[in-house]
Amino acid sequence: MSLLNSLLRLTRFWNLLIIGLAQYCTAGFLISTETIFDIRLFLLSSSTILIAAAGYIINDYYDVKIDLINKPERVIIGKGITRRYALLFHTLLSVTGVAIGFLLNWKIGVANFICAFLLWLYSNALKRLPFIGNLTVAVLTGLSIFIVNVLYPPMMVLVGIYSLFAFFITMVREIIKDLEDLRGDDTFGCKTLPIVWGIRRTKLFTYFLLALFALMITFLHQRSAPLPINFFAWSLFLPMVALVGWLVRADTRKDFYQLSQFCKVIMLAGILSMAFL
């Protein structure tokens, strides 16, 4: 396996493309089409992608032993890339991403620094705690969309809604991934929700999260500003209903893996739905 191929797999290249797409769609469709060719948007997206890539690397660095049980075929560190080079790439990507943020403005620079630190802390400790690790990743994902509005104020309700969407669907996906990785996590003493609560209660919690998202959007529609609620019904809510129906029947590792991939499809569909608003 070549070094380049190993790096692309280690940094989840396709996930990084989705992050960039989300930020460009947010800027172009929810804020202003004039932002698409703005160099500041390119720099913001680049810094976000670099920090996310660094996060994937450090996560795999700390998870090598667990991954050898849960997904041995996907382990890169120690095979395609040495642990020393993995740490080097993580540091370079993190520092570059934070530096680009400060070039844009101090608020984005500080946000990027906090994100880079939280990704390291998540990989080192938080992901082994019930709920806290899931919450951290979900907040960072929602922030990757919201930060576009920090670059291009004033604050917009639709950007906030899609940030919430990214937050909740990521939270659910992270919990489903914990269900998928139950055996390896338990072996190494991780205290994820499925281990602490059991599969049934963990599933119930994911249903609650999805229902809470729908209730929050309905509340905003009634109390804040009129929203395209019918559009959201089929573009955001309907896929979530399908997710719940599938999750109810899921009970094998393969089922949870497929559900995790379906969450990525829902996320991508949600991002693309911005183009139709």
Question: Where do the language-model regions lie?
Answer:
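Transmembrane alpha-helical core residues of multi-pass small-molecule transporters
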Residues: 22, 47, 93, 114-118, ...
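Proline-centered turn/helix-capping motifs that create local helix->coil transitions or kinks
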Residues: 16, 58, 62-66, 184
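Membrane-embedded alpha-helical segments that form the functional core of polytopic membrane enzymes
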Residues: 20-62, 97-98, 102, 106-122, ...
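Intramembrane alpha-helical segments
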Residues: 2-10, 75-156, 161
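Small-residue-rich segments of transmembrane alpha-helices in multi-pass membrane proteins
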Residues: 18-26, 77, 135-152, 194-196, ...
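C-terminal membrane-associated helical module and adjoining short loops/tails
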Residues: 2-9, 14-17, 94, 124, ...
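Short helix-capping/hinge motifs at transmembrane helix termini and TM-loop junctions
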Residues: 30-34, 104-106, 126-127, 152-153, ...
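Multi-pass membrane catalytic core of lipid/isoprenoid biosynthesis enzymes
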Residues: 46-47, 64-112, 190-226
